Amino acid sequence: MPSLLLLTLPSFFGLALAQGVGNWLREVHPKLQWSSCAAEGDCQKIDAEIVGDANWRWLHNDNGYLDCYSYNDWVHGTCNSTEDCTAKCVYDGIDYKNALGIQTANDSVSLKLQTRFDFSYSVGSRTFLMENRTMYKTFTLLNNELAFDVDLSTVECGINSALYFVAMDADGGVSRYPGNTAGAEYGVGYCDASCPRSARFIGGKV
């Protein structure tokens, strides 16, 4: 299975597989350039974009503003069963700079550990490189060389700041799970071997 590029700061929440899309905030992916080079050194700049992981998105009731998930638990006043929460809860767009502290400039991306906004704050973030608006970028690792410059000068001891590859569905699971209309465009489908117990959705269901 192809691997996907992720840029990661520590997560204190868990993976998520969002099913639907809300309409409170339009999703606008930050732009990011990267270069693809031939063996002879001829490089071509690729105008791409990144997307924030669904786990850092507002999960709320469809056509409403009631939280579905808060303080690492489901809000039973909003939904009260696996079927109910799966059907009712949707993810919204991200204010990347002001809510998550994610900024891009040409071929660089900056992530903040903590970002304060509107009487609250966010901790950590995770982003994925995109092929286009609705598909993650996949890489063939065999017989290819990949290079990154990573600035860790402001990362303090004990903070997990990582850049790595992970196997995922390129479309974020849209083709595998009929109820999943958010997909890669909304950062859905992260998966790794650690099996976080705080997962909100697994296999398209709560």
Tell what function each PLM region has.
Residues L15-V206:
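A long-range scaffold signal marking pre-active-site subdomains of enzyme folds
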Residues M1-G20:
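Fungal secretory targeting signals
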